């Protein structure tokens, strides 16, 4: 389980852990090993030819990998039969990916994952700090397996500080950073009606991966990108609060429809929000619908197959 005490933003910033996070960048990009420079692969899209392993679930991590997929990356979502999933979140956050089952506690499946790592550019995970290191898949171990790999770590409390070992979700981040404290009425704490920390963290994670890939292309190296829900909560809090006196800013049905796309999934046609970011020459889009969990083989597409999928 996980949880957190309701704090004001001032209480959070004066706490030991809040002070640690306040002294760090929102997106940490740490060079952890040397390797030769690797120019980005040639292709028609920003991330054509980039391969990403996505070992995340629920929201923030899947959003990060989904963002890579909408820009042309071959994203393979790795999960295990029996791991808890939320169907609605799976349908919303995995457009453009493939999905396979691997049990990391199985020696055979762990060996298969290591083989996938050797062909990967990005490895994204959302376990508590140190969890995957105990299984031989920490950032440093991964950099030895595949020099030049970009590791993305997503957590609730970040990698350093007295709370770094704790797990947590969107609600925990809102609760401890002051969002919940200030969001209620009549001094009663209340959560935001949306997963703002999760989505913000996912997009920041993808942004960090892009910066790390650019650095790898220029100077080489393996990189560890770190983002956290609490850092995102602190960022959101700093933007200030809207006044109840301000007019309603909800989108109309016609505006929502204009921003939506339809995917033909195994569960049937799915109408959902399209990519948020728009580029004039390389428009982000997904070439695959949300996959069936475990419905793909644990292997990379060949160059020709990846290129066709990226178009």
Model regions: which residues?
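Hydrophobic alpha-helical scaffolding
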Residues: 103, 122, 162, 166-169, ...
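Rossmann-fold NAD(P)-binding glycine/threonine-rich loop
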Residues: 134-182
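A structured beta-alpha segment of the ubiquitous adenosine-cofactor-binding alpha/beta core
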Residues: 53, 98-144
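Glycine-rich phosphate-binding loop and adjoining beta1-alpha1-beta2 segment
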Residues: 73, 77-104
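Short, well-ordered alpha-helix to beta-strand connector turns
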Residues: 72, 96-97, 120, 169
């Amino acid at each position: 389980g996980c949880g957190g005490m309701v704090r004001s933003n001032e209480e959070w910033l004066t706490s030991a852990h809040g002070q640690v996070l306040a002294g760090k960048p929102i997106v940490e990009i740490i060079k952890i090993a040397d390797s030769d420079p690797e120019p980005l692969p040639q292709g028609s899209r920003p991330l054509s030819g980039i391969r990403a392993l996505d070992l995340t679930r629920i929201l923030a991590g899947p959003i990060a990998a989904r963002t890579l997929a909408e820009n042309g990356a071959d994203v393979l979502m790795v999960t295990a039969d029996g791991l808890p999933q939320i169907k609605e979140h799976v349908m919303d956050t995995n457009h453009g990916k493939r999905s396979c089952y691997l049990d990391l506690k199985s020696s055979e499946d762990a060996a298969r994952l290591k083989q996938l790592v050797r062909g990967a550019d990005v490895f994204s995970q959302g376990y508590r700090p140190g969890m995957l290191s105990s299984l031989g898949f920490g950032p440093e171990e991964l950099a030895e397996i595949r020099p030049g790999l970009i590791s993305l770590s997503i957590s609730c409390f970040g990698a350093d500080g007295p709370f770094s070992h704790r797990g947590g979700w969107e609600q925990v981040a809102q609760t401890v950073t002051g969002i919940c404290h200030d969001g209620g009425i009549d001094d009663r704490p209340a959560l935001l009606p949306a997963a703002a920390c999760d989505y913000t963290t996912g997009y920041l994670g993808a942004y960090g991966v892009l910066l790390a890939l650019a650095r790898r292309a220029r100077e080489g190296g393996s990189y560890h990108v770190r983002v956290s829900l609490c850092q995102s909560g602190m960022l959101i809090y700093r933007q200030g609060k809207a006044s109840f006196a301000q007019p309603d800013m909800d989108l109309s049905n016609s505006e929502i429809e204009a921003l939506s796309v339809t995917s033909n999934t195994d569960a049937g046609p799915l109408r959902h929000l399209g990519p948020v970011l728009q580029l004039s020459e390389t428009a982000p889009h997904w070439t695959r619908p949300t996959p069936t969990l475990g419905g793909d083989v644990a292997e990379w597409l060949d160059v020709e197959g990846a290129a066709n999928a990226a178009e």
